[in-house]
Regions:
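N-terminal export leaders
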Residues: 6-16
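Sec/Tat signal peptide C-region and signal peptidase I cleavage site
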Residues: 22-28
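Amphipathic, charged alpha-helical segments and their helix-to-coil junctions
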Residues: 30-67, 87, 91-123
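Short, well-ordered alpha-helical segments
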Residues: 69-84
């Protein structure tokens, strides 16, 4: 999917080994938020983005889902900032590395992801 880049790949490996999987950055997320987002991913309305955050494949008017996505993205931002500080990179690089690892290891068939060019694709 994404081409390998040594620095990003190394950071992705660090993220995977240091924190579990980059898909679990929102350790403080509520189980209801996670359930809402997982259902939306299955329905094809929410997907993973190349920057490491969740995004809407289809715009939504559901305030509960919007809040759940925001909650998870906020937790991911904290994790990326913490990881960046520890490894001397920017939070953006940490997010991209996490997304790359997620795209390669955690996306299920049928899941949507937004590539680096901004195009939504289905695995």
């Amino acid at each position: 999917m994404l081409r390998s880049h040594p620095t990003r790949r190394a950071l992705a490996i660090l993220l995977l080994t240091a924190m579990g999987t980059p898909v679990r950055p929102a350790l403080a997320q509520s189980s209801s938020s996670k359930a809402l987002v997982e259902a939306a991913k299955t329905a094809g309305t929410v997907g993973e983005q190349a920057d490491g955050y969740l995004g809407f494949v289809i715009p939504q008017d559901d305030p509960g889902l919007t809040a759940a996505v925001a909650e998870i993205n906020t937790a991911r931002a904290r994790l990326y900032a913490e990881t960046a500080r520890r490894h001397g990179v920017s939070p953006e690089v940490a997010g991209v590395a996490a997304a790359k690892a997620l795209f390669e290891t955690k996306l299920r068939p049928g899941d949507y992801y937004r590539d680096a060019t901004g195009v939504w694709r289905r695995k």
